[in-house]
Amino acid sequence: MAGFNTGVAYSKLFNVVDPKVLEPKKEDLQGRKMFKVNTLADPWALTYEWSWKEIMGQSSGYADRATDITVTDVSYHKEIGYIAERTAAFEYSQADLERANTGGRNIDIVTDRAVATHDALANWEDALIFNGNGDDRHPIYGLTTDANKAGYQTIDDPSVTLQKVVDPTNENAFSDAYKIVNYFMDAAAKITMLPGYHNVKPYLALAPKEYDLLTRPLVNQYNPDKTLWNMIQRGGNNGENVFAGIRPITELEAQYWNNKTGKDGKKDMAIVYLDTPDVAQIQVAMEPRRYGQAVASADNGLSYKQMYIERTGGLSVKFPAGIVQLAGLNDGSEKWAKSKADAKAERAKKEN
């Protein structure tokens, strides 16, 4: 590499790095797959506000000259949400560039570090949306926050796990499958039975392992292609789907939120929810952006460091009852559903 052109290096920072860092890719941001984004007018706001109304009163009978006629009333309640911020920095030097492109190496170190910076901010945003900030003074609740604290609905664990239902050795697969189907329908009904929500259809989000199990074939010689997915999305309500959609969300795996020990600490979570702004939305004050200017460091201008910043309120939950936490779909034993080949071999072994 003949020399180091600081002008070229500086332009790389913005022509190559910025598109990687600043573009909020939806496939990388799990929370944005589930909820819509609301951008605040003030990027440096410390808080944001919203109001909800409480309607009281009822009609009454009337008699001539009656004076005890009931009066209705509407009260407006103001809520305050908090904004959190996080920064991530990107740096590279002449030595980095030369080392990455000599000795038979051809490494795009600029792009790789830009992606790492993007991922750092994206991971923080998702952690805030799903886990909250754990700050008692300025709380931001996440989807996996304790339901009693956040006000979410819950449902008792199902009587069977998804692993058991789809296990090829399960001779009662269809009977167990209907238990799971009814469990999901009961979870959806927690929302659809609320006043004013009878005609809505919630979404289901669950960990990728459980999502995969929904697509595994059930043991049945007459319907070999039958799956839990078919039954959930073709069952009840005259053949209509139970959910508006089913989404695999990595952040719902136990390793990202579950602080318990033993088997309980390996149980994943699922969420049944509405994605409308009246229930919840992601409050963004400032999308990832450059913070300040990249200035050449003291080593004769041979390296640059640029900081990026994001400011967000995480998930603003306005109607907690529109979110239902589900647990117990896996038992934490780490036992995976056996393949058909394994099950067949096991049966043959027993027969011999």
Where are these regions (language model features)?
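Long, hydrophobic/aromatic-enriched structural stretches that serve as scaffold segments
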Residues: 29-106
